[in-house]
UniProtKB/Swiss-Prot annotation:
NCBIfam families for this protein: S16
Similarity section: Belongs to the bacterial ribosomal protein bS16 family.
Protein's gene: rpsP
UniProt protein name: Small ribosomal subunit protein bS16
Species this protein is from: Shewanella woodyi (strain ATCC 51908 / MS32)
Highest taxon above the source species: Bacteria
């Protein structure tokens, strides 16, 4: 099954997550199909916390992709901010 989920990056104690579309059988940080955004939980000051390509997310969800719980919340937050 194709899922939209977080892939961890960044440094030790400084997480940075790419929001990716990947096959659920692949490793968390492994091969992915498409990168649709990022999430920076440690953003300071004017740094961007969340960027998401909502058009591509909508495309994947309508084509049957599932989302992780955290990504579903981030999508909801991004839609709220865009409106």
């Amino acid at each position: 099954m194709v899922t939209i989920r977080l892939a961890r990056g960044g440094a030790k104690k400084r997480p940075f997550y790419n929001i990716v579309v990947a096959d659920s059988r692949n490793a968390r940080d492994g091969r992915f199909i498409e990168r649709v955004g990022f999430f920076n939980p440690m953003a300071r000051g004017q740094e961007e916390t969340l960027r998401l390509d909502l058009d591509r997310v909508e495309h994947w969800v309508t084509n049957g992709a599932g989302t992780s719980e955290r990504v579903a919340k981030l999508i909801k937050d991004a839609r709220k901010a865009a409106a």
